[in-house]
């Protein structure tokens, strides 16, 4: 029989208040709290801590504080990753971000899904869908990316956008919901 954690990573319905999940969530909350308390000028210490939190990152990963995530180990970022203040990643499923990606302030990336039916939602059951972001992507401030989204390479997402469907490579998207407004070179 699968554990709730195994169900979560498999994209199956799982009980979000499971004891094992709560322990993992709290461990990550503590790690994020510790990261957020490191002085901004202590770059080496910050980088060491963020590498402990994330599932994959490089020496050139830079995430401005504060930073929040649920598990951390499900987040994989490529080379030369930069995120500005207040990045929130609900990583119940894997979040994979390519090389040369830049994220503005107050961006939220969600993988957790809940029922829209209040009775079902109150059971604390949910499911998760991975988010994949390609190479050379700029995500403007206050953007929200919903569960299950794939964003192609060479994409710009305008500030304040809500990404509710996949984004092809080589475009600029803006709005709520985010829509393609033009193609980009590259």
Language-model segments: which ranges?
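Flexible, glycine/small-residue-enriched loop-and-beta-strand segment within the central core
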Residues: 40, 67-77, 82-150, 171, ...
